[in-house]
């Protein structure tokens, strides 16, 4: 029994080795046969290629092709291809005897009766005979260059025909593996696919329907050698490809057609009917041609997504319904085929020779399609349609497309989310607020904030923040954005991109701010919402890390001398808005409040001035009274070096940083370095807000501006030919002049520039340079504040020839506000008896000043409810009507800055102010800093139209909003 087991094992081992050797020998023989047959076919093909046809030197119109069918193991797919072949019919039978090389051993062990054991080993050599039969025959070719399968002779059996792949490469046509049928006397055919070590030695699959390679600019066609089934041959006609529909010119570059559904492939499903809710003749179902490889799809800009690659390979879940599939490719860029043609669908090619664009209801219906690529490309095409087209935006809202797009923001596929957000960005752009309200009503703001928290793709974050920036220009949406997105915008974007760290490492260098598009969009959004009102300002001030991060970003910009970009502009505007009414709204402001001046503060100041002027230095009692009341009414010590700032037990943070004297140097640096008009206006406005109010910190701010040599910077900016810069600087100087020392310096060195602006209001130096009413009123109010309680400043006004300019303005101005403000200044000048003699010598009579004063109402010097002004940044005028009308096929992503995301809103115009106070007098020379940059040249700063406050009976401080 034991001998039988040993014998059986040995036999099995020998049989296995025999089979291995047999197949090895068979392989060698087949390889030799391949070379032999390939050589014969190549020799037979050369005469036909040389001789041509009809003596014209051209190849024969009827090409000799071999239709090869590969039959693999059961369950494998068949592939069809065409290849050149010799002109003769060849039928061969090859018999190969295979020597395994290593003989098979049979071992037997026999034990005799005497106990001896005998081992016998027998070597057996087996020969395997394999018969390989090949049949090569001529296949007729039709006029379209394709094999005639219908009505032609049967293809016949296809026996073994695995030609050498080197021949296939030399043949000049597409290649495919041939079917093989091994007839062997022993052993089975090895299972598994054959090795494919060459990319050209591949077989095609009917069911996969993969994209063909980009063989040339037009892509592969039927003439490129790919076999087309007869039933779908009409979809790929031979000859020139159909061009774009009439009236549509070809795009000049790849970016010209970035969006839209693709229609250059079609499924081989049984039914070619349109998808649900679509017209039957709209051929958006994919037509699939056999693959000859896969080409590369270039893109105009980086367009990555988390799982965008999955969309490219997705197949419809319902094979029997030819759903309107879009081109399955990543990104919003169209196929390269779109550059030169648009292939018609099978259905529409029979009815309409041209491909038609989808209707808007069809595009919106695709947003509900079960196939994700359809949703993604429909949203991208919708974004393309909405670009600079207010009518389409309105129709999308009327057809209730906005809720569909908002719902796609929570889609599991990143590509769908990205394209839906891009469509919402375009739909929310513009002055029409109906779309913004519709997005709010369907929960668009919370959905965008959720997407921002979840997205890690930079482009998605740009789209989300850009959409929020658009929505933030709509007044009712500002608090909605604050409620749902303030924390996310701050902690996800502002803090990380600003370079600020809550716990900085002392050993490492502070990080610089990153001026990314995401940061620009987010800061623009916060810039808009910061102008909503007191509650919005309170929420932003108390948001942890926001003020710290914004100041760090501005310090980084000043350090790198990069102060002209939009991100810096947005940050300064936010700081200006948050500084508005800071003396009233911040927690604990009551502790720092100083005594409010009475309504007759100017008269009290005049009495104090006359009492102090009783002697050369003033009376002793007056000096002692002033010393003990040191900082009353905003006054400060004559010697600035003795001004003690509050002692700190810990570093300031959060909203406390808004009004610290240290920020003065930052704003002055921006005023010195920047050439951006909006940045200059915002920085001057921030100083204007901080120096307003009767509290201790305003006193410190006014003194710090003088100490940091900021007065020459502001005075020089009065020469700017940009209207809004002159206005902001004039109001800032008015607030700073509440400091007595500042008033004397400004009166001596700024009066000439102020008077020049008054003259320009009457006679502009050039066409279009006329100052606006608000600017003229601001300049006149500043002059009035300077000459009040200051005889020397009134003399400076006379020396600057200001009286003739004021009288002419009263007589000729069409503005009631300008005339009243000028009358108040003239009335104040005539009140100084010391100047009346000089005025009369110059030919001025009392009647001139009385007639001017008769037009003014109210007590002398009471130009407004207060003597200082604080405001927020005016709302940026988007000027959509002045935009360039670019191609509707290109969405200017970089051009959608604050001018593109903000809209004009004239509803918020609330004048604010408080009373003025005089200060002790002391004069010091105003020195210019030689190291400071000169102001930007005038011609580069055109006048900017600004929404102004509604005219009032009294001159009102400018109070405008972002």
Curated annotation (Swiss-Prot):
Acidic residues: compositionally biased ranges: 270-280
Positions of the UniProt region annotated as Required for interaction with RNA-binding proteins DDX5, HNRNPH2 and SRSF1 and with mRNAs: 776-962
Coiled-coil residues: 8-46
TM region positions: none
Pfam families, per database record: Arm (PF00514)
Phosphoserine carried by residues: 267, 332, 335, 343, 345, 606, 864, 871, 915
A single GO BP: cell-cell adhesion
Subcellular location: Cell junction, Adherens junction; Nucleus; Cytoplasm
Stretch list, region Disordered: 95-122, 186-253, 266-290, 590-614, 854-962
Ranges of biased composition (kind: Low complexity): 206-217
In-chain residues carrying the UniProt-annotated modification Phosphothreonine: 102, 104, 642, 872
InterPro entries: ARM-like, ARM-type_fold, Armadillo, Plakophilin/d_Catenin
Role of this protein: Contributes to the regulation of alternative splicing of pre-mRNAs.
Listed PANTHER family: PLAKOPHILLIN-RELATED, SPLICING REGULATOR ARVCF
Assembly notes: Component of a ribonucleoprotein complex containing mRNAs and RNA-binding proteins including DDX5, HNRNPH2 and SRSF1 as well as ARVCF. Interacts (via the extreme C-terminus) with FRMPD2 (via the PDZ 2 domain). Interacts with CCDC85B.
Stated name of the protein: Splicing regulator ARVCF
Annotated source species: Homo sapiens
Organism lineage string: Eukaryota, Metazoa, Chordata, Craniata, Vertebrata
């Amino acid at each position: 029994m034991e001998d039988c087991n040993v014998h059986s094992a040995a036999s099995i081992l020998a049989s296995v080795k025999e089979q291995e050797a047999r197949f090895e020998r068979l392989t060698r023989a087949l390889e030799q046969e391949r070379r032999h047959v390939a050589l014969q076919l190549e020799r037979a093909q050369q005469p036909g290629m040389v001789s041509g046809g009809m003596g014209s030197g051209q190849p024969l119109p009827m090409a000799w092709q071999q239709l090869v069918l590969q039959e693999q193991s059961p369950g494998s797919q068949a592939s069809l291809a065409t290849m050149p072949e010799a002109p003769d019919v060849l039928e061969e039978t090859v018999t190969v005897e295979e020597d395994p090389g290593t003989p098979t051993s049979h071992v037997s062990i026999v034990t005799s009766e005497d106990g001896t054991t005998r081992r016998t080993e027998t070597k057996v050599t087996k020969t395997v005979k394999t018969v390989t039969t090949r049949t090569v025959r001529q296949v007729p070719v039709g006029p379209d260059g394709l094999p005639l399968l219908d009505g032609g002779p049967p293809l016949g059996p296809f026996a073994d025909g695995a030609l050498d792949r080197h021949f296939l490469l030399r043949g000049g046509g597409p290649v495919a593996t041939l079917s093989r049928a091994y007839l062997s006397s022993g052993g089975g055919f090895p299972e598994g696919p054959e090795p494919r070590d060459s990319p050209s030695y591949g077989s095609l699959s009917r069911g996969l329907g993969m994209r063909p390679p980009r063989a040339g600019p037009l892509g592969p066609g039927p003439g490129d050698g790919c076999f087309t089934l007869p039933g779908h041959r009409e979809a790929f006609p031979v000859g020139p490809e159909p061009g774009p529909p009439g009236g549509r010119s070809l795009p000049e570059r790849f970016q010209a057609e970035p969006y839209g559904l693709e229609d250059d492939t079609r499924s081989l499903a049984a039914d070619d009917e349109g998808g649900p809710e679509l017209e039957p003749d709209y051929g958006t179902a994919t037509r699939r041609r056999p693959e000859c490889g896969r080409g590369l799809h270039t893109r105009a800009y980086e367009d990555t997504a988390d799982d965008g690659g999955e969309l490219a390979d997705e197949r419809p879940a319902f094979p029997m319904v030819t759903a309107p599939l879009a081109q399955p490719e990543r990104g919003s860029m169209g196929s390269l085929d779109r550059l030169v043609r648009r292939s018609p669908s099978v259905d529409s090619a029979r009815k309409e020779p041209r491909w038609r664009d989808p209707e808007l209801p069809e595009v919106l219906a695709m947003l509900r399609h079960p196939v994700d690529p359809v949703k993604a490309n429909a949203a991208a095409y919708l974004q393309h349609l909405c670009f600079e087209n207010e009518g389409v935006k309105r129709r999308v809202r009327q057809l209730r497309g906005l809720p569909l797009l908002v719902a796609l923001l929570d889609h599991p596929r990143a590509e769908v989310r990205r394209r839906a957000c891009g469509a919402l960005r375009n739909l929310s752009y513009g002055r029409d607020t109906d779309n913004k309200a519709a997005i709010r009503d369907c929960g668009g703001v919370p959905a965008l904030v959720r997407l921002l928290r979840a997205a890690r793709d930079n482009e998605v974050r740009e789209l989300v923040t850009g959409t929020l920036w658009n929505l933030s220009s709509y007044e009712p949406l500002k608090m909605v954005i604050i409620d749902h997105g303030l924390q996310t915008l701050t902690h996800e974007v502002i803090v990380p991109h600003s370079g600020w760290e809550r716990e900085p490492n002392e050993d490492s260098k502070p990080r610089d701010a990153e001026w990314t598009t995401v940061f620009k969009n987010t800061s623009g959004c916060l810039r808009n919402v910061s102008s909503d009102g007191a509650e919005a300002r309170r929420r932003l001030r108390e948001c942890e890390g926001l003020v710290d991060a914004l100041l760090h970003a501005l310090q980084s910009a000043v350090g790198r001398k990069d102060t002209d970009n939009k991100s810096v502009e947005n940050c300064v505007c936010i700081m200006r808005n948050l500084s508005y009414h800071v003396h009233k709204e911040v927690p604990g402001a009551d502790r720092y409040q100083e005594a409010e001046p009475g309504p007759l503060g100017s008269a009290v100041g005049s009495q104090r001035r006359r009492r102090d002027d009783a002697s050369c230095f003033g009376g002793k009692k007056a000096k002692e009274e002033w010393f003990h009341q040191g900082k009353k009414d905003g006054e400060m010590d004559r010697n600035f070096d003795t001004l003690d700032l509050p002692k700190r037990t810990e570093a300031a943070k959060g909203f406390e940083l808004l009004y610290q004297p240290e920020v003065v140097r930052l704003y002055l640096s921006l005023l010195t370095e920047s050439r951006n008009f909006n940045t200059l206006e915002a920085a001057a406005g921030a100083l204007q807000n901080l120096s307003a109010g009767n509290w201790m910190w305003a006193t410190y701010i006014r003194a710090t501006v003088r100490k940091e040599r900021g007065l020459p910077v502001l005075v020089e900016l009065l020469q700017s030919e940009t209207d809004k810069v002159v206005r902001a600087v004039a109001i800032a100087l008015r607030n700073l002049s509440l400091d007595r020392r500042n008033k004397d310096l400004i009166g001596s060195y700024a009066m000439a520039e102020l008077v020049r602006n008054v003259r320009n209001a009457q006679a502009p130096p050039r066409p279009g340079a006329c100052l606006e009413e608000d600017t003229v009123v601001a300049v006149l109010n500043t002059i009035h504040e300077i000459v009040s309680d200051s005889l020397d400043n009134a003399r400076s006004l006379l020396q600057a020839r200001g009286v003739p300019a004021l009288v002419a303005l009263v007589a000729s101005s069409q503005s009631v506000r300008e005339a009243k403000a000028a009358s108040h200044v003239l009335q104040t000048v005539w009140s100084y008896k010391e100047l009346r003699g000089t005025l009369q010598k110059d030919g001025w009579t009392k009647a001139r000043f009385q007639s001017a004063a008769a037009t003014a109402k109210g007590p002398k010097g009471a130009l407004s409810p207060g003597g200082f002004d604080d405001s927020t940044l005016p709302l940026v005028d988007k000027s959509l009507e002045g935009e360039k009308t670019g191609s509707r096929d290109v969405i200017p992503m970089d051009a959608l800055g604050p001018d593109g995301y903000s809209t004009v809103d004239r509803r918020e115009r609330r004048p604010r102010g408080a009373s003025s106070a005089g200060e002790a007098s002391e004069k010091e020379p105003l020195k210019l800093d030689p190291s400071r940059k000169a102001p930007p040249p005038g011609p580069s700063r055109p006048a900017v139209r600004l929404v102004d406050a509604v005219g009032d009976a009294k001159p009102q401080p400018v109070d405008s909003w972002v």
